[in-house]
Amino acid sequence: MGISRDNWHKRRKTGGKRKPVHKKRKYELGRPPSNTKLGPKRIHTVRVRGGNKKYRALRLDVGNFSWGSECCTRKTRIIDVVYNASNNELVRTKTLVKNCVILVDSAPFRQWYESHYALPLGRKKGAKLTPEEEDILNKKRSKKVQKKFDKRRKNSKISPLLDEQFQQGKLLACISSRPGQCGRADGYVLEGKELEFYLRKIKAKKGK
């Protein structure tokens, strides 16, 4: 039997059975879930009603993630799935769905921050820098350019929780697109109260 999104196969509110008045219709069809996994990109196209296309992501490993407080969006690697409010099974199988909490690579965001503010981010005291990083952070600048960076630095404060994550090289993020519908895993970096909430949830899950 095909997957059907009708309600005439259900019993009535009073408990009585319904006689099927017609066969299943094309407009009532449903399709199996894509269960998008972590891995090299694999996307299938599905022809849907009206001749339109849906992009069914079967495997994904990168996505566009937005760092809201800094208005910065970067393409970055998805490392792992760590939490899902609806089902722990989806965490175990590393399934990417909307609103699941994942770990993403922090390198693109750190590069942007260091070039934008000329300040180190998530680096240990006295850590060795590569020549390129040294050039970005400790370059001699003209007075005009230095003034511009000083003005920017007034807003360069980062929460201790985020700084801790940058030191580990991984950021907690949330997927806000629907990988099984649009074929992409895009989302945003968790910050503030939302980050605290999910850290508590993840810690509680580990403690079990």
Curated annotation (Swiss-Prot):
UniProt-listed Gene3D superfamilies: 3.10.290.70, Ribosomal protein S8e, subdomain
Disordered: annotated segments: 1-40
Keyword check for Ribonucleoprotein: yes
GO biological processes: translation
GO cellular component: cytoplasm; ribonucleoprotein complex; ribosome
Pfam short name (any one): Ribosomal_S8e
Subcellular location, record wording: Cytoplasm
Compositionally skewed regions (Basic residues) per UniProt: 8-26
InterPro entries with a match to the protein in the record: Ribosomal_eS8, Ribosomal_eS8_CS, Ribosomal_protein_eS8_euk, Ribosomal_Se8/biogenesis_NSA2
Principal subcellular localization: cytoplasm
Record GO terms (molecular function): structural constituent of ribosome
Keyword hit for Ribosomal protein: yes
Key words of the record: Cytoplasm, Ribonucleoprotein, Ribosomal protein
Subunit structure: Component of the small ribosomal subunit.
Functional description taken from the UniProt entry: Component of the small ribosomal subunit. The ribosome is a large ribonucleoprotein complex responsible for the synthesis of proteins in the cell.
Family to which this protein belongs: Belongs to the eukaryotic ribosomal protein eS8 family.
Listed PANTHER family: 40S RIBOSOMAL PROTEIN S8
Protein name: Small ribosomal subunit protein eS8
Species in which this protein is naturally found: Ictalurus punctatus (Channel catfish)
Gene: rps8
